[in-house]
Amino acid sequence: MSNQQTHVRKPDWLKTRINTNKSYRNLKKLMRDNRLNTVCEEARCPNLHECWSERKTATFMILGDTCTRGCRFCAVKTGLPNELDWGEPERVADSVTVMGLKHVVVTAVARDDLNDGGAAVFAETVRAIRRKNPGCTIEILPSDMKGDYESLHTLMDSGPDIFNHNIETVRRLTKRVRARAMYDRSLELLRRVKEIAPNTPTKSSIMVGLGEEKDEIIQAMDDLLAHNVDIVTLGQYLQPTKKHLEVVRYYHPDEFEELKNIALEKGFSHCESGPLVRSSYHADEQVSNAAAQRRIKYMKGVEKQENSQLDFNF
């Protein structure tokens, strides 16, 4: 593809309006008052309204707001992070309670400055959520922690309901897209999760539109399946700023549907695939049956409680 063709106009199916009404502002205030970050906000996710209000799910970003890596697709700021905040786990758990979430995703910036990659705080966050919200299902989305499997054990000992780690792109493009990560290291991390916790669903995500070929996407699916990954999500890469990688191509919704069919035929237990799909999209549907039943019982109790003083209805 020539340089003149790289500046592709965004198609109509990607043009969405971000909801910034009173309820959104209240939620944002809750996050700031508790000194918390969400990927939903950082990435200006187009699905924020649906997840926070309708599906009662949210994705918290812990370990600060500064990443030690500088992946060329990601909008999160990079630099030297602050010291660990050991009060963060309880604040996240309290916010889950106030928001009445039924499913929560906990992700984090990469903390290569820490020996354990932040695994101890990550694990304590999961435990704090579980203590205060026993029926809420929990998905974790960590970095590769530089392949430190002791840190992986620390994470898995906290008992998450889903383990998510994204390969992000196909093998050929990994060095350009996420220079300090390794394709095979990510796959091995996912495989080892199944050794530690065979019944925990594993999940990964692929962005398209960075210059990959269809056969490379299919090969990435095969690689994930070979490492016992259960769930895959596929979404369109969108350039956060002009400093980030340009979009090479926008995939049509029909192409995403085709990729979903391929993924399911290959044996993934669940696949979300669409232009606006992100790693945590419809994450509440992807937990195991046992975890889902625990959540159903919990939510029945939540619905009987009085509404919070904050208005979270959109």
UniProtKB/Swiss-Prot annotation:
Pathway: Protein modification; protein lipoylation via endogenous pathway; protein N(6)-(lipoyl)lysine from octanoyl-[acyl-carrier-protein]
Entry's localization field: Cytoplasm
Radical SAM core domain ranges (all copies): 53-269
Cofactor note: Binds 2 [4Fe-4S] clusters per subunit. One cluster is coordinated with 3 cysteines and an exchangeable S-adenosyl-L-methionine.
One GO cellular component term: cytoplasm
Signal sequence extent: none
GO molecular function, one term: 4 iron, 4 sulfur cluster binding
A Pfam family of this chain: LIAS_N
Cofactor field: [4Fe-4S] cluster
Reactions that this protein is recorded to catalyse: [[Fe-S] cluster scaffold protein carrying a second [4Fe-4S](2+) cluster] + N(6)-octanoyl-L-lysyl-[protein] + 2 oxidized [2Fe-2S]-[ferredoxin] + 2 S-adenosyl-L-methionine + 4 H(+) = [[Fe-S] cluster scaffold protein] + N(6)-[(R)-dihydrolipoyl]-L-lysyl-[protein] + 4 Fe(3+) + 2 hydrogen sulfide + 2 5'-deoxyadenosine + 2 L-methionine + 2 reduced [2Fe-2S]-[ferredoxin]
Disulphides: none
Root EC class: transferase
Entry similarity comment: Belongs to the radical SAM superfamily. Lipoyl synthase family.
UniProt xrefs under NCBIfam families: lipA, PRK05481.1, PRK12928.1
Name recorded for this polypeptide: Lipoyl synthase
Organism: Oceanobacillus iheyensis (strain DSM 14371 / CIP 107618 / JCM 11309 / KCTC 3954 / HTE831)
